[in-house]
Amino acid sequence: MTKTTMAVPGALLAAIALLSAAPAQAAAHRVTPGNWLYVTVTTGDARSSHISRLLTCDPPHGHAHAARACEELAAADGDITRIPPKRTFCPMIYAPVTADAHGEWNGRHVEYRHAFGNACGLEGETGAVFALSEQASDGPTPGLRS
C-alpha cells in the first residue's frame, strides 16, 4: 500500500506541472489573429497627451476610419512607409506629433515610429492609419505640397 499512496501524489504533481505549462505555451501564440496594429498618436512630447487604438482588419474595426486604414494598409502590404503620400498643402505651424504602431500583418511583425511637424503632415504621409479621432478631421488641404 505504501507504494500505491506514493504513486498517487507523484502522478498529481506531474499533472499539475503539465497543466501549469499549458498557459505559458498559449501565451507564446498570437493574442490577436489576423492583420492588426496597435496605433498611438502622441501630441507634443508629453506621454500624457496620447491616444491609442487597436486597429483590426478582419473585419475592419478600431477607430472611425478603420475600413479606409485597412484598405491603405492592404495596398501597401502592411508597410506604413509604402502608403502613397497625399498631394496636400499643410500649414507651416509647428505642433509636433509622433506616430507609433506595432502589430502583425500577413504573419510579419510590424514596427513603425515617426515624428511629424503637425497632424496635417501625419495624415498626409500615413493616410487613415493614424486618423484616430471619432470626428471627421479637417485633415490636409488638397493641393500641391510645398
Curated annotation (Swiss-Prot):
- Signal peptide stretch: 1-26
Q: Which PROSITE patterns match?
A: SSI
Report which superkingdom the organism of origin falls in: Bacteria
Name the predominant localization: secreted
Q: Which GO terms describe its cellular component?
A: extracellular region
**UniProt entry tagged with the keyword Glycoprotein:** no
Subcellular location(s): the record lists: Secreted
GO terms, molecular function = serine-type endopeptidase inhibitor activity
Membrane-crossing residue ranges in chain numbering: none
Keywords, alphabetical: Disulfide bond, Protease inhibitor, Secreted, Serine protease inhibitor, Signal
- What is the disulfide pattern of this chain? 57-70, 90-120
Family statement drawn from the similarity comment of this UniProt entry: Belongs to the protease inhibitor I16 (SSI) family.
Name of this chain's protein: Putative serine protease inhibitor SAV_2156
